[in-house]
A protein has these predicted regions:
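Active-site-adjacent structural elements that line small-molecule/cofactor binding pockets in enzymes
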Residues: 1-320
Length: 320
């Protein structure tokens, strides 16, 4: 999914925007199987515990971990990614148990984007203070990492403590990649030290200045990574891919959605790759064309220029 100086392409779910009718999600798992066969690098799911009409976005509706477990059984190669799990809302043991279970069932394909949360309604619903989310995020990430270590553990955290017990199952490859989303209330230096990768919004996508500003942000982060080690950067965009391949990149809904033809999209992906982006997660739920048609065009005309790296999962998935 990630390699230095290379960009891969993934797909954000849902493939059709939920607006009160669950029927729009019918057949989505079949299309995810198609995404897997077509060679996309990843499928991404959101973590939206409550639908807040003021946000107007319910994500893929389903619980992210339950749904990824279902999709693990419908796919063989594609990475299964959260974008992003709000780890400040839930206990680290429960999060880690769900994550490592999916990682084992999928043969090591889980990539975990993590976030502190940005919807104020969720925190009092969980009995938590919205203002504490940054601190809880940092504690939760540390706790989860400790849980995945080998052997009997001794953990003493503001979020809980125990001694002399082992956490199971362990991740397939010894750890699950934890990609910090945005700032999550942390400094850039903290993200450089503690994150396995960084997922950020892309800035403007219809002009050259957006990728230029993104490149500056990525360079500033990478300059702070201890030892200069490679860590991937990811970004995303919601697109309305039109039939005309020459249609110019045009922002819609205040820049939330990009209407574009294939050539404009490829130019954007090339600019992102030059900026240091290693993975682009595209959301197609606002496209006017059928999802299957958009996926076919992306697979036929875009993926050959941004191929997935084809790494075999570290182990065979469990036999369901």
């Amino acid at each position: 999914m990630f390699a230095p100086d290379k960009l891969t392409v993934g797909i954000f779910l849902p493939l059709r925007n939920y607006a009160g009718d669950m029927k729009v999600l019918a057949g989505q798992a079949d299309l995810v199987s198609q995404i897997d066969r077509q060679g996309f690098a990843a499928v991404w799911v959101r973590d939206v515990p409550l639908f807040d009409p003021s946000f107007g976005d319910a994500g893929q509706v389903f619980d992210p971990f339950t749904y990824l477990a279902y999709l693990a059984a419908r796919t063989k190669h594609v990475a299964l990614a959260t974008g992003s799990a709000v780890i400040s809302l839930r206990h680290p043991i429960d999060l880690a148990k769900a994550a490592t279970t999916i990682d084992q069932l999928s043969g090591g394909r889980l990539v975990m984007g993590v976030a502190s949360g940005d919807r104020p309604i969720e925190f009092p619903a969980y009995g938590l203070e919205h203002g504490d989310r940054a601190e809880r995020f940092a504690h939760a990430l540390s706790y989860m990492r400790q849980l995945m270590q080998a052997g009997l553990l001794a953990i003493d955290s503001p979020l809980g403590r125990f001694k002399g017990a082992e956490f199971l199952p362990k991740p397939v490859a010894g750890a699950i990649p934890m990609m910090v989303t945005g700032s999550s209330g942390q400094s850039l230096a903290w993200i450089a030290e503690h994150a396995d990768g960084w997922l950020t919004y892309p800035n403007a996508t219809h002009t050259p200045t957006g990728p230029q500003h993104l490149a500056e942000k990525i360079r500033a982060w990478r300059d702070l990574i201890p030892g200069g080690a490679f860590r991937p950067h990811m970004t995303n965009e919601w697109i309305d891919l039109v039939d005309d391949p020459d249609h110019p990149r045009t922002p819609l809904h205040g820049g939330y959605v990009l209407r574009t033809g294939r050539k404009g999209l490829m130019a954007l992906l090339e600019a992102w790759q030059a900026a240091g982006v290693n993975h682009a997660a595209l959301g197609i739920q606002f496209s006017q064309r059928p999802a299957s048609e958009v996926l076919e065009e992306l697979a036929a005309d875009v993926l050959p220029h941004f191929p997935s790296h084809g790494a075999v999962p570290p182990c065979r998935p469990w036999n369901f």
